[in-house]
Amino acid sequence: MNLVQVNIKSGGYLKKDLILNDISFAVKSGELVGLIGPNGAGKSTILKTVMGQLPYMDGKIDFPNAHTHYAYIPEQPVLYDNLTLWEHLEFAAAVGKMSRETFVSRAEELLKLFRLYKEKHRLPVTFSKGMQQKVMLILGFMMRPALYIVDEPFIGLDPHGMRDFLQLVDQVRQDGAGILMSTHSLDTAEKICTSFILIHEGTIISQGNLEAIRQQSRLPEGSLFDCFISLLEMQS
């Protein structure tokens, strides 16, 4: 089942300064779709478009189920100066109309998973970048939506944090959630994503599973990195 269907003819922050062109893809239940490309390729802009945050867009973003909820986990942590970690979680639970019992159970489980339980009464603005990234992951996964939109989740995560994140990804996919994740970490993406959307200069140069990407790049045994470089060379 499609959780979101994206059809962007063009998009940008100004109508006269378009960034995206001819972007079409879907995210299905149980999928982890990797939005792959270098810095400045348009990955974050595509995510903003999916969420309706781009000032100009010609096209359509369709959520077939009107009741589909999504969680957005940004690349840069967004935190309140005067709220403790626990208060951040309480606030998110209140916005999501989560019962107190469910909130406490999920929050404590995630805090322990990411080894932040002892820090729950501290201010996250004083945390390291990696710890702040874990806070954003906890906030997103605590809500258990049908769709996760995740922007560069690996930046700042230590190996334990990355393992914990990947464990959660497997769990929510098994529960039927879909994930749209942008990253330029091709080695990790190759290992975990079910399909890929390769972006260059605001347009799709290839998409599909790894086998399809290999066929399109004419590298039958190539890594995702090698395939991406080959496809870029074909564009030039």
Where are these regions (language model features)?
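Conserved ABC ATPase signature
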Residues: L123-G130
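Conserved ABC ATPase "signature" region
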Residues: E90, A94, E101-E119
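Helix-to-loop junction immediately C-terminal to a conserved catalytic motif
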Residues: M51
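Catalytic Walker B motif of ABC-type/P-loop ATPase nucleotide-binding domains
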Residues: Y148-E152
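A short, flexible loop at the N-terminus of ABC-type nucleotide-binding domains that lies
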Residues: M1-V6, S10-D22
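The feature captures the beta-strand-to-loop junction immediately N-terminal to the Walker
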Residues: I36-P38
